[in-house]
């Protein structure tokens, strides 16, 4: 059976001198793995459209146990990400998060596809700082994947106003000054600007998701919180994250 869809290539693997196995986040079928035959040759008609980070239209043969790409047409390559190793590493980290949070052939992934495409665009075009972009992506993909934290009111007493708050990754939410003593888990004191930013990353309209800024210190605080929450949710160390952080430090 032949099917068509658009999608972003989030991983590629060489399987012979001429063929690749690519992992695609598609609009219609979620994550699929498809064979791309002969595409390692520059003469192949699909060569330019099955590279890592390519957003393409695909015509795919769907068999009982495998997909094979028949035709593809690149809509956006994000090629300039390869010119900056820090941006390249961050883009690979974003793709790794998708692979860890989205099941193969999971349906209704349109918003996740939109998120990664918007994020790669902002990353490639230097629209916002890498640190802030990373935090927005982490919180939004967690929310879309079922890890929506409580950022509205205290997770203990439900107080929502006139309080100082802490974020506790282990309980998936915030607690107030009065209740924080009840928890021995690692916690992050929230300034008003960081709490606003956390809420914005989750609750803002999709087309306004990146339309805010923070001072450098607040960006650092937000980054520490979103990364800690992400690692708590995925419950594993991510080599792509470790590599990105090494680049940022150095």
Segment roles from a protein language model:
Residues 1-250:
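Non-catalytic alpha-helical scaffolds and adjoining flexible linkers that form interface surfaces
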């Amino acid at each position: 059976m032949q099917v068509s869809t658009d999608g972003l290539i989030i991983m590629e693997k060489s399987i012979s001198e001429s063929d690749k196995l690519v992992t695609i986040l598609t609009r219609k079928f979620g994550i699929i793995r498809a064979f791309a035959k002969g595409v390692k040759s520059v003469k192949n008609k699909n060569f330019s459209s099955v590279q890592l980070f390519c957003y393409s239209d695909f015509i795919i043969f769907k068999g009982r146990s495998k997909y094979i790409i028949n035709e593809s047409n690149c809509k956006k390559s994000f090629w300039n990400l390869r010119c900056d190793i820090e941006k390249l590493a961050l883009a690979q980290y974003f793709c790794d998060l998708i692979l860890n949070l989205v099941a193969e052939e999971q349906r209704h992934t349109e918003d996740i596809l939109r998120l990664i495409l918007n994020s790669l665009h902002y990353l490639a075009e230097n629209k916002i700082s890498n640190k802030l972009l990373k935090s927005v992506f982490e919180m939004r993909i967690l929310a879309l994947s079922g890890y929506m934290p409580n950022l509205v009111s205290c997770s203990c007493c439900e107080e929502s106003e006139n309080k100082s708050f802490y974020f506790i990754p282990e309980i998936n939410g915030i607690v107030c000054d009065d209740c924080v003593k009840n928890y021995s888990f690692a916690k992050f004191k929230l300034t008003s600007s960081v709490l606003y930013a956390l809420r914005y990353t989750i609750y803002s309209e999709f087309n306004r998701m990146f339309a805010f800024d923070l001072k450098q210190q607040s960006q650092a605080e937000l980054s520490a919180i979103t990364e800690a929450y992400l690692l708590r949710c995925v419950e594993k160390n991510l080599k792509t994250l470790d590599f990105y952080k090494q680049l940022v430090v150095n």
